């Protein structure tokens, strides 16, 4: 049996962290949680990186956009899969997320099955496939303007 995927859930809302932890743990993930982008960046500065990050956009101190930008600018985490999760479902926000380098996008409230499916979908792609998918999503959203 292979080791479970490691997920880092980053959200300032305790109920969302708890729900995501419960759902992902039941799906076989090993879950770590952070209450802010700042806390997530501290966790990600260590040697034991997760396989994927579920990242909220609206958080105090360091928001999801800034966290994603810092992750993509760091050689250690530049290719770490990141799925953005936000109540902001506006096309401009979605385009911003893809442009900054997210690998997936979930709206809140998220569908429990959809959360697990999206993380598995992103994890199934290698780095080149994720970058290609990002470019395609950006082009689709730009055309839809």
Name every feature range the model reports, one short phrase each.
Residues 33-52:
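Acidic, metal-coordinating helix/loop segments flanking the phosphotransfer/catalytic sites
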Residues 124-145:
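CheY-like receiver
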Residues 110-120, 131:
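C-terminal output helix
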Residues 59:
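Receiver (REC) domain active-site loop signature in two-component systems and cognate sites
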Residues 103:
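Short, glycine/charged-rich "phosphate-handling" switch motifs in NTP-dependent
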Residues 18-26:
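Charged docking surfaces used in two-component/phosphorelay signaling
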